[in-house]
Every structure is written in C-alpha cells, then in structure tokens.
Amino acid sequence: MPMLFSDSLFNSLTIITAILYVSGAGLVAVNMLNNTIVNKQRQLVLASALAAAFMHTLLVLHSYNINQMIANDFFSMLSLVFLVISLLFIATAFSQPVETLAIIVFPFSAIAVLLNIGNSIPATTNVNLDSALQVHIILSIVSYSLLSVAAFQAIFVSIQEKQLHDRHPGRFIGRLPSLQLMETLLFRVLSVGLALLTLALATGFIFLDDIFAQHIAHKTVLSILAWLVFATLLWGRHSLGWRGQKAVKWTYGGYFSLMLAYFGSKFVLQLVLNQS
C-alpha cells in the first residue's frame, strides 16, 4: 500500500491547505471592505488560490495512490469535488472578474479538506473499475463540480438582484461585476455543466450493466431529474428570456436533485448507518 505522506504529514498539509483557502477568502473579504486596487486583489487571491489548489492536489493524489483508484468514501469524494470546483474557479478567474466568488467557494473547500484529517488511508472498494467506467466517474465529478460553481454563482446573482431592486446596494454589491455579466457567466457554466452531465449519463447507460440496478437506481433517477431541470432552465432562458430569481430558483432545484444523487445515499450509508 504505497503512501506519499505519513499520517502526521498528511494531517499537517491538510491544515495548511485549509489555511490557504481561508486566507484567499479573507483577502477577498478585506478588499471588498476597502478600496484596494483590483489588480492587486486579483493577484493576491489567485496566488493564494494556486497555492491552496496545489497542496489540495497533492492530498488527493496521496489518496489515489493508496488504492490506485479514485477514493470512494464520502469525505475523500467531497474533497475531490471541491478540488475540481477550486480549479475551475481559478481557471475562470484568469479570464473573468469572478474572484469575489472565493468568499463562498474557498471556505467550503477548506471544510472539505479539513474533514479528511485522519483519513490518510481512505476506504477501499471491492468494485472493479475499468477504464471506461472511470471515464464515466470523471465526467460525473467534473459535471457536478461545474454545476456546483453555477449554484454558488446563483447565490451571488440572487443577492445582487435583491439589493439592486431595493436601490440600496452596499459595498459588497459594488465590488461585484455587473448583474448582466454575472447572469451571463451563470448560464455559460450551466450550459457546459449540462453538456458534461449529458455525457456522464450517456456513458453510464453505455458502460454500466444495469444503470437502474437497486443500489444506483436513485442516483440515476435523481440525475435524470436534475438534467431535466437544467435543460428546462436553459430552454426557458433562450426561448422565454428567463433570468433573475426565476433562473436562480431553477438552478437551486436542479442542483439540489444532483446533490442528492451524488452524496445523499453515500452520506446516509457511511455517516448515518455506518456502512462502507
């Protein structure tokens, strides 16, 4: 069982990674309260984000190196998802002014990392994952991560629109990109996320022997429901001009269904019923 890090080093790196994530969120919070130069803010936040993501990647690689496959326990999977979310955020931040999202994304990433303290040897799985099935898993993780970013984005759109309608936008809102840009980014992320979710479902139907088998039937049904919600939202956007709170509510609905599909049963089995 090869290990990249000892238990103590793994735990130390976990704490350092969480501190880096929180530092990035703290920089955004401080700069939103002060009149700090935007370029300086972006540089500091991105530097902290890159350092945190690098450390986070090492921790995930350590978990992968144990079993030579993606760790299947709840906390390891949660950490992997938030690593992908953080990487997607960083990639977007280099081309779009979305660094304010760090104030929500990074604290969740820090929590996901900290929940793995003492989990340097993640649980094994008895399922034989061939390369085709691993493609399905990777597509599922990336699509879920992208749609998680969309859910975070929807929170900001909701807050921004409500404060603008009240005609008393605070300093927080003043530091955000325009509402039009925020909505445009939201629907771009939703479009790519839905495309990847479509591929994830398609590969599941192709590569899984029985995608409606008892132990994964709920995941399939909830994922299809999420797909229908997101597809309807994008149709409503292009055909009926849906935006604002309607778009936010549909995003929340689709994401809630997808969250139950990905983590609902795993949470109940591993943390409530204490089963592997």
Walk through the language-model features, giving the residues of each.
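Juxtamembrane boundary at the C-terminal end of a transmembrane helix
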Residues: 261-276
